[in-house]
Amino acid sequence: MVSFSSILLACSAAIGALATPIEPLADHPNEAFNETAFNDLVGRSTPSSTGYNNGYYYSFWTDGGGDVTYTNGNGGSYSVQWSNVGNFVGGKGWNPGSSRAITYSGSFNPSGNGYLAVYGWTTDPLIEYYIVESYGTYNPGSGGTYKGQVTSDGGTYNIYTSVRTNAPSIIGTATFTQFWSVRTSKRVGGTVTTGNHFNAWAKYGLTLGTHNYQIVATEGYQSSGSSAITVY
C-alpha cells in the first residue's frame, strides 16, 4: 500500500486486527529447525490483542516482524517501544467511538515511518479513519486525494481520501475507503475535537457509518522508535 493503513486489523475479525501469513517452515526442508532461536524470535514482540484496561478500550496488532513491546499503563496510558518492525498499531480509547473531544499527552519518537493519530473504524459504510497529529518520515497525505482543509484545536489539517481494494479490515478482506485529516504543524499533546473533523469530512462528501472502536494510536512501519501516550 502507499501508506500504513494496510496495517489494519484483521488478524481475526474478532479482535479487529490483520495478519500477514508466515512462510511455513515446511517450505524449507533443508533448513534445520532451531527451536530455541525460534522461541527467542517470537518472544520479542507483544502478541496482538484487544480488550479493556483500567476503564479504556485498547487494541494492539502486530504483523510479528521485528521487536515491538506494547504495555498498558495506569488509566488511559500506554507505551510502545519498537525496533526494525514490520508493521504494528496500538493504543487506548473507546469502543464504540463517537464524536467526542479527546485530550491526550505524552511523547512520540519515531525513527522512520510512524504515525500518532486518533484512529478508528466505522461500518455501513466500512471506513477506516485517521486524524494524524504527528508522523515520522512519511506524510500519509501524499498517498491520497486531497479534498480540502479543516481548522480545529489551534491547527490546520489537510483532508484526504483513498480507497483500499481487497485489503484486511475489521470485517476481513474487503474494499473500503480511508478518511484522513493530517495536521500541517505536528504536535504531541492537546485536544482533538473529532466532531470538527467528522463534520468537515461530511462537507466533502465523506460520510462515516456506525462507529466501531476509536483509539489514540501509535503506528510503526519498517521503523524503530518509542511512544508513551496518555488518553483522558
UniProtKB/Swiss-Prot annotation:
Pfam families: Glyco_hydro_11. Keywords: Carbohydrate metabolism, Glycoprotein, Glycosidase, Hydrolase, Polysaccharide degradation, Secreted, Signal, Xylan degradation. Its main location: secreted. It catalyses: Endohydrolysis of (1->4)-beta-D-xylosidic linkages in xylans. Residues 44-232 form the GH11 domain. One of its GO terms (cellular component) is extracellular region. Optimum temperature is 58 degrees Celsius. Has complete stability at 60 degrees Celsius. SUPFAM superfamilies: Concanavalin A-like lectins/glucanases. Belongs to the glycosyl hydrolase 11 (cellulase G) family. This is Endo-1,4-beta-xylanase A. It comes from Aspergillus oryzae (strain ATCC 42149 / RIB 40).
